[in-house]
């Protein structure tokens, strides 16, 4: 198995028309990853969410990390940010998909030391996806454990 890329993304939800919130999310992702995020436009129209395909403001922002920046971000995530999560018992073991990729949800961005107090005035979550070239989830989990990601024990906590 091989770690191909890390995608850090954040959906803006009901704040998609709020320019200030969009700016906060963009600045947060830029400070955390060191790269400028790309706005994601809706692919499908969903009437109940008042979203039209390809129209209006972005519904989310994402950054794709590869190479040295990917490993640097992973190191900061594992050694600095994860220990700062309140009531953290390990990363969830259910975040693997069939292809062996791993998804990690972070409930608030304040765990990253790059962000100051004014950057965390409005809290929002992040999604971190580890795209792994692997045959199954067991191989991917073993790879991520070697990198140092602490997973929950099999029996719960």
List where the protein language model places each region:
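Ribosome-associated RNA-binding proteins
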Residues: 1-157
